[in-house]
């Protein structure tokens, strides 16, 4: 069993937001507060400590009361760059990640990921949901061993950026969540307005 104090939570808010017109998705208002704050309020009770990966508006994220770390790679290099800085700054054996634009993910997300990671002696546990009759992995909703940092850095230094290609190099377990709507995100302003 993995204790939550051995897990650091990371909110991934370092994207370019290109499908939302280039605006900072994590700072967009949802039910009276920024989406990243919703994510933080859901994630913080599930982990020992939390932090944010962001590449702009750092002061706004710092005002949420947790450490904020920008990518070490230039040009909005994608979620793996955020994972890398999270693993570099993580002081616990495990890192849990969630995106900033999904404000309703399950309150037992980390507990369930940790349970399966330990049970199956995996390196990475990822959430998976049923969509159109197919089980679909949600790789940015994951829990991983911080010992994977050298592997990720080598992968990024080779010029690769695809999260699925990196996770495929490790022992992964998918953890099925029945409520696919809990993982609904807002990639566009229209999707943000449609979130319940």
Swiss-Prot record:
Keyword Magnesium found: yes
Residues binding GTP: 12-14, 25, 53, 71, 101
Gene Ontology CC entries for this record: cytoplasm
Annotated residues for binding of Mg(2+): 101
Any Pfam family the entry gives: NTP_transf_3
UniProt GO MF annotations: GTP binding; metal ion binding; molybdenum cofactor guanylyltransferase activity
Superkingdom in the source lineage: Bacteria
Entry cofactors: Mg(2+)
Gene3D superfamilies: Spore Coat Polysaccharide Biosynthesis Protein SpsA, Chain A
GO biological-process terms attached to the record: bis(molybdopterin guanine dinucleotide)molybdenum biosynthetic process
SUPFAM superfamilies for this protein: Nucleotide-diphospho-sugar transferases
InterPro entries: MobA-like_NTP_Trfase, Molybde_CF_guanTrfase, Nucleotide-diphossugar_trans
Reactions accelerated catalytically: Mo-molybdopterin + GTP + H(+) = Mo-molybdopterin guanine dinucleotide + diphosphate
Keywords assigned: Cytoplasm, GTP-binding, Magnesium, Metal-binding, Molybdenum cofactor biosynthesis, Nucleotide-binding, Transferase
Comment text on domains: The N-terminal domain determines nucleotide recognition and specific binding, while the C-terminal domain determines the specific binding to the target protein.
The protein's assembly and partners: Monomer.
UniProt record similarity statement: Belongs to the MobA family.
Protein's name according to its UniProt entry: Molybdenum cofactor guanylyltransferase
